[in-house]
Amino acid sequence: MTVKKILSLFVLIFFSASGIVFSNEKVELTSLGNKDSKVIIKVFSSLTCPHCANFHKKIFKKLKQDFIDTNIVRYEHHGFPLDLAALNGEKILNCVQNGKKRIELLNEIYDKQDDWAGGSDINNINSNLSKIAKKHGLNNDRINNCLKDENIENEILNERIMAQKKYSIESTPTIFINEKKYDGKHSYNDFKKIIEKIL
């Protein structure tokens, strides 16, 4: 089965099981940098995807230091959950209102992916995620409310479907620099050259 079919199957099964009805609730975009930057990087990734964690730890952090923190480049994280654990992670991530603090939580979610994503069941995984989230200003009530929020859940999955249709995403991470598509196999130096060429 192709990756594209697997992604579609996850959404189909989840919708069928939960009886989802789309809402008008909007998911806050996780982003850093000047919105008017000449270079905009969009990263479609799943929080449980090892390649996504590798990209975030080895490439994003260098891009942040060299280009994003100086407002040369705008970075956008677009959640593309491949499973329920990743979906719940996105829901918790969305509960952090401050953009920089949300990126800090995203950093730790990826840094500690092996610790939380390998839980024995979804309850154990949620508990592991909660321990991380508490260090970033969320309490138990807030976390539980976020996990139960069907409006946010619907919107995350809706945005994933729209991204699939618009960008034909077949694997994660998929990176777009000014709407040009790249996969996660590129190195930091590859992306650095691409950005510098645009600038």
Question: Across the structure, where does each feature detected by a protein language model lie?
Answer:
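Extracytoplasmic thiol/disulfide redox context detector
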Residues: 2-83, 87, 134, 154-167, ...
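Cysteine-centric redox/oxidoreductase cores and disulfide-bonded domains
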Residues: 81-171, 176-189, 193-199
